[in-house]
Amino acid sequence: MDRRSSLRLIGGTVAGATLGGIWRGARAARPETRPDILVVVVDDLRWDEFGAGGHPYLKTPNIDRLAREGVSFTRAMHATPLCSPNRACILTGQYTARHCIYNNEDRSLLSHLLPTFPQELQRSGYTTGLVGKWHMGNDPTPRPGFDYWVSFQGQGKILDPELYEDGRLQKVPGYVTDLLTDRALGFIRRQRNSQRPYFLYLAHKAVHPDAIQHNDGSFDLAYGTHYIAAERHRGRYRNEIFPRSQIAKTAEQGALGSVMVQRFLARKNAESTVREFGDILDPGMAEQSIRDRAEMILSVDEGLGAILSELEESGRLGATAIVLTSDNGFFFGEHGLSVERRLPYEESIRNPLLVRFPRAISAGMRVNELVSSIDIAPSILELAGANIGGQIQGASFLPLLAHGAARRVRRSSVLIENYSDDRPFPWVLDADYRAIRTDRQKLIHWIQHPEFDELYDLTTDPREERNVIKEPANHGLVERLRSDLGKLVQHSISL
């Protein structure tokens, strides 16, 4: 398969029958035929960390509404399950090996040069805005492709943050989720009488804990990390318990399938590491942290509700495509892990991808085919009738939303990769890997330690507790997956 074919897979062959075909050539048509587009990115949100996703006590009626009235992608994956790299994957449609935002170090200069899809939307006639977390460098100034820009330095702060808006950085009193929602609403309201469609990228600080991250990617250990819910939500879930029946009770039990995880945990639990990092080590495993995260998400859900109400009041809800996603998942003790969100296990790589657009998407759809975060960019460009450049490595998922003969299965596997540094968490310093995830299997290749590669049958072992790579019966399967992984890697680095 040549590169152009592999980029598009089947998207181009059914363009006339897919959703994107509705708006192809729309620049010559009436402006209202092109949808307004809202992308909401929730930081660190697990694929199951909202009501409709299966959370046992968190109530998220507005996020659930997107799922109920739109499509849920049940096998969407993060191309690199880590903050900065995956944000670049989402915005460029490229793998990390191509866009080169490898980790959370300060990539300010490089991030000014990224070929992002909002630039193409802007060229095609959209008014574009970014509100919230850029997090590809600590430079808060505007990046190319956005007419409106409100952001902050690096991780930002939860309470009384410094926001860069109107050309300067200034401290603004309030809770960051509410402040970002207010600015998103302001942008949307200013477009009410515009003849141009708009695109808004709303990237929340939540549900990431408060933290200070230096230019080299390391955290300010004296400051620590803190989950802080809006005052009105604190204590809402104080008596709730997250069920642990499907989570290993100890780190040792959780690491049984992986020699690499056992190595990571041995370093993490070393006396010197505990002494240096303190309470940063295990926020995801603490019951209170899981409650605090749930309470933080409540303000995100309320903000989404306010936006939905504004769109309904203006009569634009039906003409607005809304995408909700995250940059990576998180561990609640699975495999004995918590903050090691970059590792290639299901809790971290699965993406809570929802899309609502009633003009073209049937309510309550569930798409079980594999989708990657690099597919978001070409999907939005196709939806907008804009050009999908050859630099984009993802493929539009719109063909998966078509019906009948137009519907196609796009890919049989996805690539997941990580390039570790790692100053924030030195116990995973050698966690560089490339992994292939199919409908049924996952093969993990540890770049520095191939002798510890892993294979899981996700149908019989969904919690990835039994590494079966050395079982003789799997020899042929391992060789096939290695070959397929090699092809994906070749595509990821191709020009």
Residue ranges and their predicted role:
Residues 2-447, 451-454, 462-483, 487-495:
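Formylglycine-dependent sulfatase
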